């Protein structure tokens, strides 16, 4: 946590011969800054610039070192991206500023432009556990359970047909319908 993986210099005979960013190798597999070391070379490891934590529904949640000017989109790229159950439209960020913390809800269209600073904490939530197109049928039907609500399953008659009809023990004089939404 003290030394940088992003700003490493190789000095030879008093002259800087290379700047090495280990993330280029670790995250992208690029060896663009690969240099052969010689006897007497000095390797200078700078202190880190910005450490940013990311937790929640990303593939590699942990603390990352970010260079000055790197965006939230870059951080998400370093994590390997979102998991399948991540809510991608907005992420929450906590930033320490002076004496207090500030919270930001960053929309997906702003990921490229939102610049991270030292000690930012990013949280990616999961999608909600509710359904937007679900109807359930229970009781004296052959296939009780959840069904997709769409133009095909738009009537109770069609729902009963999808549940493979009523069983012989069904009480045909009454049914109970419970609606959870006003629409």
Predicted features along the sequence, with ranges:
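Ser/Thr/Pro/Gly-biased, low-complexity, turn-/loop-rich segments
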Residues: 1-183
């Amino acid at each position: 946590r003290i030394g940088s993986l992003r700003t490493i210099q190789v000095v030879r005979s008093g002259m800087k011969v290379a700047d090495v960013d280990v993330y280029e190798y670790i995250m992208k597999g690029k060896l663009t800054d690969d240099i052969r070391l010689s006897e007497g070379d000095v390797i200078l490891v700078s202190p880190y610039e910005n450490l940013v934590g990311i937790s929640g529904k990303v593939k590699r949640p942990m603390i990352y070192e970010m260079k000055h000017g790197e965006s939230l989109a870059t951080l998400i790229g370093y994590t390997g991206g979102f998991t399948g159950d991540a809510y991608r439209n907005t992420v929450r960020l906590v930033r320490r500023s002076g004496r207090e913390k500030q919270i930001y809800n960053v929309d997906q269209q702003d990921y490229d432009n939102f610049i991270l600073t030292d000690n930012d904490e990013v949280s990616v939530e999961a999608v909600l556990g509710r359904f937007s197109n679900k109807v359930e049928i229970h009781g004296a039907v052959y296939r009780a359970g959840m069904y997709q609500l769409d133009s095909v399953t738009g009537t109770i008659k069609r729902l009963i047909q999808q549940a493979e009809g009523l069983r012989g023990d069904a009480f045909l004089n009454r049914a109970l319908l419970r609606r959870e939404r006003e629409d």
